[in-house]
Amino acid sequence: MYDNALHIRHLGKQDYESVWHAMQHYTDNRDENSQDEIWIVEHTPVFTQGQAGKSEHILNPGDIPVIQVDRGGQVTYHGPGQLVVYPLLDIKRLKVGVRQLVTHIEQSIINMLKRYQIEAYAKADAPGVYVEERKIASLGLRIRKGCSFHGLALNVDMDMSPFQRINPCGYAGMEMIQCKQLGGPQTVEEAGAQLIETLSQELGLDKLVHHQGLPESYE
């Protein structure tokens, strides 16, 4: 039974594909009684190519796997030291439109960075969050049956060199930046704790229930 809470799942370090398939499974099997969940994870190195992605934007993947996925957007990189957050929300029940959800997610990142005196902003024509024209967070969602999956990636303290092997989000020469360079949160755990606060505030959901690991049936 839906309990009007936001269930936060702390997944730790996980490979991309197992988490992707688990969130597909969760979304496909939801009904009006399913909980709204947010999954927090750090992925092993991977390039993911969204539905709008073009192969020419993957310049030189080397030994990092490339996975074609069912989210919006183009190619991005996930790796250790990056906070990845997947909001699995019934947006119909929350009475939130898709564009509104994107705005809530972007604003929650902006509000979180503001706590560290970092001035970040969104761009109308290029989803994500930016600081001084450099990208600090990427965003790519999918809506199925009125429910969201996939989500956001915030660069915290990571090896940024793999971004040079792609045109991030399809933009040649797009410069990336991370929290550590700016005096922001120094660990994925710190960033995750802060972002859950600002994201739940943006969504108007103040009852939080924390869990460790994937739902049992999806492990």
Curated annotation (Swiss-Prot):
Residues 32-207 form the BPL/LPL catalytic domain. The keyword Zinc-finger does not apply. Pathway: Protein modification; protein lipoylation via endogenous pathway; protein N(6)-(lipoyl)lysine from octanoyl-[acyl-carrier-protein]: step 1/2. Its EC number is 2.3.1.181. GO terms for molecular function: lipoyl(octanoyl) transferase activity. It is an enzyme of class 2 (transferase). InterPro entries: aa-tRNA-synth_II/BPL/LPL (IPR045864), BPL_LPL_catalytic (IPR004143), Octanoyltransferase (IPR000544), Octanoyltransferase_CS (IPR020605). Substrate binds at R71, G72, G73, Q74, V75, T76, Y77, H78, S138, L139, G140, G151, L152, A153. Its main location: cytoplasm. Belongs to the LipB family. HAMAP family: LipB. This is Octanoyltransferase. It comes from Shewanella pealeana (strain ATCC 700345 / ANG-SQ1). The gene is lipB.
